[in-house]
Swiss-Prot record:
Segments of skewed composition (Pro residues): 17-33
Enzyme class: transferase
Composition bias type Polar residues, residue spans: 1-15
Protein name: E3 ubiquitin-protein ligase SIAH2
An example Gene Ontology CC term for this record: early endosome
GO molecular function: ubiquitin conjugating enzyme binding; ubiquitin protein ligase activity; ubiquitin-protein transferase activity; zinc ion binding
InterPro entries per record: 7-in-absentia-prot_TRAF-dom, SINA-like_animal, Sina-like_RING, TRAF-like, Znf_RING, Znf_RING/FYVE/PHD, Znf_SIAH
Gene: Siah2
Pathway where it operates: Protein modification; protein ubiquitination
Key words, A-Z: Apoptosis, Biological rhythms, Cell cycle, Cytoplasm, Metal-binding, Nucleus, Phosphoprotein, Transferase, Ubl conjugation pathway, Zinc, Zinc-finger
Residue segments, region SBD: 131-323
Domain commentary: The RING-type zinc finger domain is essential for ubiquitin ligase activity.
Species this protein is from: Mus musculus (Mouse)
Zinc finger (SIAH-type) boundaries: 134-194
Length: 325
């Protein structure tokens, strides 16, 4: 699937279109060729998208894990927001009757949710702030498995990267707002993004077609091996004005810890030239935005792409391997 975009990868880019009948992919090397898939991009007004893949036009510190005593739970419950049931953390504001509500919910309310009294003027509860500084709070994802308790200053940073937070749809550039558990990610992709093809095996060919399309374009497909699923992403974007670049990376449909057990190699090969990148796959919890921003992936410009392309089609050899721990 494809839909070139002039607004770059941050634009809304649909990630699931029913593909027309498959086209014949570019043939890989004749000597014991690995599995191959064609990933096509189609220009405006075109509907030709091979069934092999999706093309989309167009990131804790401290604490502990000791058992929480009933007394500690009773103390932290005093900080529960009556609206969202998260914890009220400093700066702590109260209504005129002394009831607490977290700062996020307070901005949406016109009166106290407990007594219906006025929330203004803002009254600071310094005593509760001192107590909060002496208490370790559970992670907001404790109900899904996180056992850490943290100082209130460490809690927001940890929760931004907590392994137990919900997984978002990993489809890059898509407008899909789905969130769910890790176990539900593949089911979501298979049902909501059916145009993303999965190839079996640790050594495959990722063939992106129509790489000369203008604007920002993403090519996506899946690779299944070693009992896991990997997402292969090739993005073309204008990182600098007038200078388009390609970024290729592999993500694991799994946690960061699981990703450390694998390595991947991306290789452009042809015309007696070779360009190789080897790295550890990123977890889909991390996404691709940070890797692209830091060029922590296979990066090449359009001039290099044309050295390896054949009639506007670019084949990338992808090899997944396990790491000895």
């Amino acid at each position: 699937m494809s839909r070139p975009s002039s607004t770059g990868p941050s634009a809304n880019k649909p990630c699931s279109k029913q593909p027309p009948p498959p086209q014949t992919p570019h043939a890989p090397s004749p000597a014991a060729p690995p599995a191959a898939a064609t990933i096509s991009a189609a220009g405006p007004g075109s509907s030709a998208v091979p069934a092999a893949a999706a093309v989309i036009s167009g990131p804790g510190a401290g604490g502990g894990a000791d058992p929480v005593s009933p007394q500690h739970h009773e103390l932290t419950s005093l900080f529960e927001c009556p609206v969202c049931f998260d914890y009220v953390l400093p700066p702590i504001l109260q209504c005129q009757a002394g009831h607490l509500v977290c700062n996020q919910c307070r901005q949406k309310l016109s009166c106290c949710p407990t007594c219906r009294g006025a929330l203004t003027p803002s009254i600071r509860n310094l005593a509760m702030e001192k107590v909060a500084s002496a208490v370790l709070f559970p992670c907001k994802y404790a109900t899904t498995g996180c056992s850490l308790t943290l100082h209130h200053t460490e809690k927001p940073e940890h929760e931004d990267i907590c392994e137990y937070r919900p997984y978002s749809c990993p489809c890059p550039g898509a407008s899909c707002k789905w969130q769910g558990s890790l176990e539900a990610v593949m089911s979501h992709l298979m049902h909501a993004h059916k145009s993303i093809t999965t190839l079996q095996g640790e050594d495959i060919v990722f063939l992106a077609t129509d790489i000369n399309l203008p604007g920002a374009v993403d090519w996506v497909m899946m690779q299944s091996c070693f009992g896991h699923h990997f997402m292969l992403v090739l993005e073309k974007q204008e990182k600098y004005e007038g200078h388009q670049q390609f970024f290729a990376i592999v993500l694991l449909i799994g946690t960061r810890k699981q990703a450390e057990n694998f390595a991947y190699r991306l290789e452009l090969n042809g015309n007696r030239r070779r360009l190789t990148w080897e790295a550890t796959p990123r977890s889909i919890h991390d996404g691709v935005a940070a890797a692209i921003m830091n060029s922590d992936c296979l990066v090449f410009d359009t001039a290099i792409a044309h050295l390896f392309a054949d009639n506007g089609n670019l084949g990338i050899n992808v090899t997944i391997s396990t790491c000895c721990q």
